[in-house]
């Protein structure tokens, strides 16, 4: 019998060795090495948490918050170090999305078979 958790652990280990993940780690190291980029990342991270919390609680963002996020996004878009990290992050998520499609394929096939019954 297959232990799917062993397979999942191996997949996690394999992910760490992919070109996409290694590029992300390198980009993160570049952010850490640049004080301004790191501070901007931390500000962006806090802002994203604030937005998610507002969405989860159904609260509207204030005009002041919206202006802050707009300004923050403009500063992030001008920071090439952070932009490189965000592009690398996107590549990792694309890879994970592709893997998720493969993992979900048996379930999709089972439901497709049920629909045909």
Swiss-Prot record:
Gene3D superfamilies recorded: YheA/YmcA-like
Signal peptide: none
Cross-referenced SUPFAM superfamilies: YheA/YmcA-like
Any single Pfam family the record assigns to this protein: Com_YlbF
InterPro entries linked to this entry: Com_YlbF, YheA/YmcA-like_dom_sf
Entry similarity comment: Belongs to the UPF0342 family.
Protein name per the record: UPF0342 protein Ldb1541
Organism of provenance: Lactobacillus delbrueckii subsp. bulgaricus (strain ATCC 11842 / DSM 20081 / BCRC 10696 / JCM 1002 / NBRC 13953 / NCIMB 11778 / NCTC 12712 / WDCM 00102 / Lb 14)
Source lineage: Bacteria, Bacillati, Bacillota, Bacilli, Lactobacillales
């Amino acid at each position: 019998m297959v232990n799917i958790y062993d397979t999942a652990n191996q997949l996690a280990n394999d992910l760490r060795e992919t070109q996409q993940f290694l590029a992300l780690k390198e980009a993160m190291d570049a952010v850490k090495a640049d004080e301004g980029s790191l501070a901007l990342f931390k500000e962006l991270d806090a802002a994203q948490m604030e937005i998610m919390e507002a969405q989860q609680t159904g609260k509207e963002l204030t005009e002041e918050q919206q202006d802050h996020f707009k300004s923050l996004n403009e500063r992030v878009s001008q920071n090439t170090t952070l932009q490189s990290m965000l592009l690398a992050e996107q590549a990792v998520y694309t890879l994970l999305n592709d893997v998720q499609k493969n993992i979900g394929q048996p379930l999709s096939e089972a439901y497709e078979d049920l629909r045909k019954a």
